[in-house]
């Protein structure tokens, strides 16, 4: 009987000890300490990821600006084709007028040829 009593007392003490350890392990201050440790370990990596993402965002924004600027330049060039056609037409008219002037000077007896001496 005494042996069973002793066994029961030992079991109660062990249960109380286990309960106390469980309570201490899950106490709010311990939980906050564990949370702090987790943040301390995780934060540098998260900061590095954030820095990398910001750098990639800046590079992407620069590339987007460059592409938009290039598209704008190409669009301006396609819109300027009318001006190039106008210049082409004016150059053709000028060449035609010069040929007419050259032909009329070549037929005119009063016009002297330019001298070759400089």
Swiss-Prot record:
CC per GO annotation: BORC complex; lysosomal membrane
Predominant location: membrane
Region spans: Disordered: 98-118
Stored InterPro entries: BORCS8
Subcellular location: Lysosome membrane
Pfam families reported for this sequence: BORCS8
Keyword Magnesium set for record: no
Segments of skewed composition (Polar residues): 98-107
Family under the similarity heading: Belongs to the BORCS8 family.
Described function: As part of a BORC-like complex, it may play a role in the movement and localization of lysosomes at the cell periphery. Associated with the cytosolic face of lysosomes, this complex may couple lysosomes to microtubule plus-end-directed kinesin motors, driving lysosome movement toward the cell periphery.
Protein name from the UniProt record: BLOC-1-related complex subunit 8
UniProt source species: Tetraodon nigroviridis
Taxonomic path: Eukaryota, Metazoa, Chordata, Craniata, Vertebrata
Name of the gene this protein is made from: borcs8
